[in-house]
Amino acid sequence: MVPDTQQKLLDLFLNDISTLAPKGTARYCRNSWLSIPSQLEKTSRKFQYTRIAKGATAKTYQEPLQWLIQNGLVLPCHDNRDGENTARQQINLHLYPIDTGLCTRMLKIPAYQLLTGEESIANTACTETFLAQQFIQNGYTLSYWSSGNQAEVPFLLSKNNHFIAVDYRITPHQKCRNLMRLYNIRHQTDSSCPLEQLKQMYLLSTEDFKSKEHYQIVPVYAAFCI
């Protein structure tokens, strides 16, 4: 019953896109929307235009993607280093579905799989979608921090000119190095993060609430507390 209802909702979204998209962009908006499962099924969360269609470019799909974002059909997460540069934002982009349940349907996985604690690309995608959904509801603007191929903090949340860094781990044995790398960069002069505005760091985990020297551990289910 629930999967059927979720699929009906996804079909309605697709129908709305076809009907309401600006003239001449409906096909591109549909293709962008339909590429979301493919975007989520890879290790890197960075949006790849070639997964929309062969030969697809940011120039062609920038306007359709922006329309999906502005109409609340997807949740964007930009590279913090891009600032207000719209062109760069469209290149260094993470894109999430607006609902965790719809995400499971898009990826064709049963909801109970999320409770197994299994490390998988699908579980990671659904976890990040859940967190993005919670943070948006709490009024944060989403971005992420990256130091090239060395480290990435998936969520750098901003509100009232302050930033909060959030990483997560699905299983207790996963190592947490990204927050510490970000912390260490705070003491470097050449930084890729607005360090003077970095207020707090959190690790979302299966563990209970706990304080570490440089960050706070919060259970994943309590992401709304941040």
Task: Outline where the language-model segments fall.
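Accessory nucleic acid-recognition modules appended to NTPase machines
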Residues: 1-163
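Domain-level recognition of nuclease-like catalytic cores that cleave nucleotide substrates
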Residues: 206-226
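Active-site ExK catalytic segment of metal-dependent nucleases
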Residues: 162-174
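Arginine/glycine-rich "motif VI" loop of SF2 helicases in the C-terminal RecA-like domain
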Residues: 183-197
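Cofactor-binding loop segments of dinucleotide-utilizing enzymes, especially the Rossmann-like FAD-
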Residues: 147, 205-206
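Short, hydrophobic beta-strand segments that form beta-sheet elements in well-ordered domains
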Residues: 196-205
